[in-house]
C-alpha cells in the first residue's frame, strides 16, 4: 500500500511539472513581438522582469548600429517600445539588456546572421516589402555546390536557378552576386532574401529569368561557417584582402559554364554586389 501511495505521489508530481512547463511555454508565447500595427508602426516587446534597462536597436532608425531607443517597463515585467510608422521594407533589429547587446527577440522566430551577429527581422508589407516575402508565384531553386579552384581547394557556392530551369533546355544569362566584407555564400540568401526577390521580379516580368551565382569571397575559408571540414569557426570581418579571389574568378566562371546551361558570352554575364 505504501508503495502504491509513493507511486501515485510521483505520478502526480510529474503531471504537475509537465502542466507547469506547458503553462510556462504558453506564457512565453503570450508576448507578441514584433507587432505590426495598422498604421505601419511596430511594437517591440521583451519579457525581462529583472532587467534594469532595455533598449532596441535596428535599421528602422536613422543611425543604424549606433542608434537605440529606450523601452518602457510595464507592470507585467514586459518591456515595450513602439516606433513611428515605417516604410514598406525588411528591417533587422536586436535588444540590449543591461549592457548585453545583440540579444535576439525570443518571441520572433525569424533570425538572420550578418557576419557574426544574429539579428531578428520583420517585413512591413507593401510595394517594396512584398518583394522580400515569398509570394504565390513560381519558385526557383537554390543549390549549394563545390567547385575546385586553381589552388586545388574546393570552394562552396550558392546558385539560384529560376523556375522551370530543371524542366527546360534553354540557356540563361548569369549574374555573379558578391557579398560584402565578412560575408559568405549564404549572405545574399539569408540577409538579402535573394531567392524571394528573384522569384517575385521574374513573376512580374521585371527581371529576365537568370542564374544567380553567390560565391564565397573569404579566401581564408572555403565555405560559410559549419559547412566544411573547417568546422564551426566563428565568423569575423576578414582582413585577407590579398587579391587572390580575383584570380579565382575566371575559374569560377568556367566552372559555372561547364555545369549549368548558361549563355557563355560576356554580354550575357553581369557582376554586382
At which residue positions do the language-model features occur?
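Non-catalytic, glycine-rich low-complexity segments
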Residues: 22-47, 123-136
